Amino acid sequence: MDVAYGEFSCERETAGAVLEKRMIQENVQTERFFPALLEEFVTPVFLEGVRRKFHFDGGQLAEIREVAEEMLPVLQKEAFWARAVYPSENLSHVETSGINEDGAQPAMLYAAYEKAAMSLGHGVDLLQESYSEKGRLLQSYIVEALAGELLMRGYDAYNRYVAAYTDRHVARYHFPGSEEAFPLGMLPEL
């Protein structure tokens, strides 16, 4: 999603804190994670796709299913996505509709931006840590693979949602830790 942190005054607060306050102040729509994706999460087709994509051998499909079945109640309880729409306050994003023939002030067209957050919940992290602490590294990796695939499908579902219900499109996604403006340290604030 196009998240323009440069539009905010962040002298004393991190960009994540400003984003969180802004989303709270505005009408933020929070939804349970895409139900259709959760329904297919433990299906043979989904699990086989994860097995092939992440190069597990055929004999590991039962372990993948076991981990997915352990993850599902956590996902159903905690996974969500949230969105908030806001007008651009940065004049570099303002466009004019042209000068009127009668010399009147041109209309200003403000671009609308949307901030979105998507999470599978803290319980997935706890499950992965639990496997790791018990030395069950394969199961820990399976959690990572299943979560990654589910999030990728969530991004696709969100793209389709935006296209179907708004006049906007997803320009880009930003991930904490992937660029200087979005340090990994902002995660607890989101």
Language-model regions, residue ranges each:
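Flexible, glycine/charged-enriched surface loops at secondary-structure junctions
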Residues: 61, 77-86, 160-176
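Compact, glycine/acidic-enriched structural inserts
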Residues: 137-156, 160
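Active-site helix-to-loop segments that bind/position phosphate- or nucleotide-bearing substrates
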Residues: 19-139
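Short terminal or interdomain "cap/linker" segment that borders an active site or interface and mediates
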Residues: 120, 169-190
